[in-house]
Curated annotation (Swiss-Prot):
Protein name: Probable Sec-independent protein translocase protein TatE
Topology term for the membrane: Single-pass membrane protein
Localization terms from the record: Cell inner membrane
GO biological process, one term: protein transport by the Tat complex
Organism: Edwardsiella ictaluri (strain 93-146)
InterPro entries per record: TatA/B/E, TatA/E, TatE
Listed transmembrane segments: 1-21
Cellular component GO terms, alphabetical: TAT protein transport complex
Annotated family: Belongs to the TatA/E family. TatE subfamily.
Keywords, alphabetical: Cell inner membrane, Cell membrane, Membrane, Protein transport, Translocation, Transmembrane, Transmembrane helix, Transport
Entry keyword NADP: no
A single GO molecular function term of this UniProt record: protein transmembrane transporter activity
Length: 66
């Protein structure tokens, strides 16, 4: 059992290009890139908001000592 060789990957890539065409794949790639960029931006924008305090401090944690 070899797994997937480079020739098998190339054949799969050629079949995908033949089925969908280069224009459709280019559009799909740019849409995927824009989605990832938006996701990363949203994650970076959320981090400072989570760190910002509202002036309310959390109560210290109390452990049960028996």
């Amino acid at each position: 059992m070899e797994g997937i060789s480079i020739t098998k990957l190339l054949v799969i890539a050629v079949l995908i290009v033949l089925l969908f065409g280069t224009n459709k794949l280019r559009t799909l790639g740019s849409d995927l890139g824009a989605a990832l960029k938006g996701f990363k931006k949203a994650m970076n924008d959320e981090t400072p908001a989570a760190k910002k305090s509202d002036g309310v401090e959390a109560a210290p944690r109390v452990e049960n000592k028996e």
